[in-house]
């Protein structure tokens, strides 16, 4: 069996359909390798950062918060969008750590990068872990409400296995932390 090399697709044009506060919705005109023209719906996003905060007892701090798109609460690691496409992912992760759970850290280490849904969005999430947490002041946005919860790594793996954690970035982060940190 011969392996055929994939050919690159070409973006011929982009039409802004909606500009939002957090994301922009585009219609891309594409030229595919067989010569056909097609349209793709694409959400362009500045990117985000997320952090696995590990407290002095080795517990991981998560937030439970409401997500309107699914009309339910999700258990997630602290995360948030970058202020611009130029903002360093680590700077964003450190900011979200303080804003959402009220901690700074001495050690912020990169775990993995994650494309949240590459079929239709450019969003890339830089995922970090934070150790040696230092108490600071929580700075939630005006319309942001979270409940802080702490779990051991085995408890989180069990919650993932039982389908009680369904947030993709959180699943990727916890499993990457488990594998890469040898826990």
Please give the residue ranges for each predicted region.
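Short beta-strand micro-motifs in enzyme catalytic cores
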Residues: 24-28, 73, 124-126
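Acidic, metal-coordinating catalytic segment for phosphate/diphosphate chemistry
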Residues: 9, 13-50, 56
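Conserved Nudix-box catalytic region and its N-terminal flanking loop in Nudix hydrolases
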Residues: 6-8, 40, 50-95
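Generic C-terminal helix-cap and adjacent flexible tail
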Residues: 179-183
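Short glycine/serine/proline-enriched coil/turn segments at secondary-structure junctions
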Residues: 20, 69, 118-120
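Unchanged
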Residues: 38, 47-50, 81-168
């Amino acid at each position: 069996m011969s392996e055929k090399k994939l050919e690159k697709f070409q973006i011929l044009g982009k039409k802004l359909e909606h500009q939002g506060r957090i994301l922009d919705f585009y219609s891309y005109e594409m030229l595919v390798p067989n010569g056909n023209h097609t349209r793709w719906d694409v959400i362009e996003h500045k990117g985000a950062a997320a952090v696995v905060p590990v407290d002095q007892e080795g517990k991981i701090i998560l937030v439970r918060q409401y997500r309107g798109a699914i009309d339910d609460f999700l258990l997630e690691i602290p995360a948030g969008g970058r202020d611009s496409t130029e903002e360093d992912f680590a700077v964003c992760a450190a900011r979200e750590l303080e804003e959402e759970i009220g901690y700074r850290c001495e050690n912020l280490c990169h775990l993995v990068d994650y494309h949240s849904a590459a079929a239709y969005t450019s969003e890339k999430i830089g995922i970090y872990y934070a150790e040696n947490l230092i108490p600071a002041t929580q700075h939630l946005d005006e319309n942001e409400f979270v409940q802080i919860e702490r779990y051991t790594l085995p408890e989180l793996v069990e919650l993932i296995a039982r389908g009680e954690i369904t947030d993709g970035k959180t699943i990727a982060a916890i499993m990457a932390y488990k594998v890469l940190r040898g826990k």
